[in-house]
Swiss-Prot record:
InterPro entries per the UniProt record, alphabetical: Allrgn_V5/Tpx1_CS, CAP_dom, CAP_sf, CRISP-related, V5_allergen-like
Pfam families in the record: CAP
SMART domains named among the record's database cross-references: SCP
Species, as recorded: Scolopendra dehaani
Taxonomic classification: Eukaryota, Metazoa, Ecdysozoa, Arthropoda, Myriapoda
Keyword Disulfide bond among record annotations: yes
Free-text tissue specificity from the UniProt record: Expressed by the venom gland.
Signal peptide from the UniProt entry: 1-23
Family: Belongs to the CRISP family. Venom allergen 5-like subfamily.
Name of the protein in its database record: Scoloptoxin SSD558
UniProt-listed SUPFAM superfamilies: PR-1-like (SSF55797)
Gene Ontology cellular-component annotations: extracellular region
Source taxon at top rank: Eukaryota
Post-translational modification: Contains 3 disulfide bonds.
UniProt subcellular location: Secreted
Amino acid sequence: MNILLPSTLFVLLMFQIIGSGMGCDMKVRGLDANMKKMILDLHNKKRQIVANGQQSGQPSAANMKELHWNDEIAANAQRSAETCVFEHTAKSLRKTTKYSYLGENIYKGSYPDPIPRSVNAWYDEVKDVTPAVVKSFSSGGPMIGHYTQMVWANTEALDCGLVTASDRNSYLFCQYGPGGNYRSQPIYKQGPPASDCKNGKSSKYPGLCN
């Protein structure tokens, strides 16, 4: 029979409280269907702009995939959001049965529109991305990793988790499978839009691949 000392029991209870998503007083928890659609559309439209060469300073993409929502990843992201801690999820926890590594973008803010505000903020890092970085990713310099994960060509799955706490701060965690931002690898293949699609072209977002 194992006996827990009072201090050990206290730590265990605190772990259970925080780990179960009770680390803060949540007023809003999770995403409804419209919010999921908004996040997915915003991401795919940004990817489409880049793939079609419509983003100033960025080459067009031959192999950028359309993103699809993945509920298994979404459960991971929601658990992370419910900690109400503005820190990246440990890499050991960012994986699913299909993806051994998930990329992650996170946001914290007290504005009433966290979804468009966060996605636009991540995308705005494009101003510091050069064609040389597109050809061979490197992170030494201005912060660009949120943008580059958003447009990483081989990423095909997206999910997000959302919490709004009683202090009006929203925590949005988005995870991407497979994750990107690998040093010295291309963000995407430069070339005519959707000219190197392995499984056909997207019908919903011309310029992206299936």
